[in-house]
């Protein structure tokens, strides 16, 4: 368990070959995506929890990334429990912080959270059952990204008349 650090030196607002790894912050919009960078800090499937502002926003991360700015990162010991189980458990809890002016969640506070751990066979079966659902979600998200890119490329060309579609039989 750890807290997100400073923003990396090399960043881009767009995903590029030089900056292919997402940077996540404690925001709730766009799953907390802040930008992209050239080197990930977290390589394993993990769970992040926003720790300031919108406290308790839980995300399952399955690709290498960099956590920044008040984002608690949980990398489970996969011999004991899966990130998918941890994500589903935490996403159904009311996670709160401490503080009077601005609520915040600290790693020491969060480490007190009790997580029921089923035996290994049940955990393995559970993970095998839910994995295809997550894989489908991730495939859909990837397809949405590609479709957004196509839309953003084609729409300006259609609007400017650069791409003529008047002869299409629709």
Q: What residue ranges belong to the model's regions?
A:
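DNA target-recognition domains and sequence-specific DNA-contacting regions of bacterial/archaeal
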Residues: 1-118, 169
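Amphipathic alpha-helical coiled-coil/heptad-repeat segments
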Residues: 79-81, 92, 96-98, 103, ...
């Amino acid at each position: 368990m750890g807290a997100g650090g400073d923003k990396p030196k090399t960043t881009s607002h767009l995903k590029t070959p030089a900056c292919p790894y997402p940077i996540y912050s404690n925001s709730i919009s766009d799953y907390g995506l802040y930008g992209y960078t050239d080197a990930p800090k977290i390589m394993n499937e993990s769970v992040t929890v926003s720790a300031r502002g919108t406290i308790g926003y839980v995300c399952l991360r399955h690709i290498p990334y960099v956590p920044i700015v008040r984002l608690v990162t949980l990398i489970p010991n996969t011999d004991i429990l899966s990130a998918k189980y941890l994500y589903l458990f935490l996403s159904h809890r009311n996670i709160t912080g401490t503080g009077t002016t601005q609520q915040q969640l600290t790693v020491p506070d969060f480490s007190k959270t009790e997580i029921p751990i089923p035996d290994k066979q049940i955990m393995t079966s559970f993970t095998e059952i839910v994995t295809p659902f997550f894989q489908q979600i991730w495939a859909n998200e990837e397809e949405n990204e590609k479709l957004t890119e196509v839309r953003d490329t084609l729409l300006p060309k259609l609007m400017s008349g650069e791409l003529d579609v008047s002869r299409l039989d629709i």
